[in-house]
Amino acid sequence: MPSQLKGRKVAFLATDGVEQVELTAPWNALKQAGADVVLVSDKRGEIQAMNRDAKGERVHVDVEVSTVTARDFDALVLPGGVANPDKLRTNKDAVKFVREFMELDKPVAAICHGPWLLVEADALRGRTITSWPSLETDVRNAGGAWVDKQVQVDQKLLTSRKPDDLPAFCVKLVELLADAIDERRLDKMVEQSFPASDPLPGPIALR
């Protein structure tokens, strides 16, 4: 449904060297579902996307990562491309941005080499993910478990291995965000029905 994610704001964190299709495919899927998508980067202007080893399009950056926090968004997407996350993992603001999403238990989706940022943010302890196969040792050294699957979901963390996985990745990404919205709505309904200041139901209200 076009309005499935209406009002949700999703950050895409990327820089030069991002694999173009890993940026555009989930970007378009989320837009079609009604989400607002924002390209966050380590610099202003434009970034250079890649089609494997060839230059792709130049993509406009919406906001610098140093000027925003995870609280400004509902979810985060980490596309791959080797140079992209390898550069971002050396940027303290980018790493902090990723860590904040994980600490706030917000949906995070990463594909291919994107999970390198999760490794750098020390956000994989006790988590099970997939990625480009060469990241397996990095994931395990960071305290995570690695599996070879098209799509892996661990709570609100979604990961996939490569561009060929994008169709399944995009479907699951929209589902993950929709489920998170439903969960928040339920929490809000409970809070409205049973405010924290209300006495407990039953014959005795504890003080």
Language-model features and meaning:
Residues M1-L104, V108, W116-T128, E136-I181:
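Extended, subdomain-level signal for the structured scaffold at the beginning of enzyme domains
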Residues C112:
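Catalytic nucleophile serine of serine hydrolases
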Residues W132:
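Active-site-adjacent substrate-recognition loops and nearby beta-strands
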Residues I181-R207:
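Intrinsic, low-complexity terminal and presequence regions
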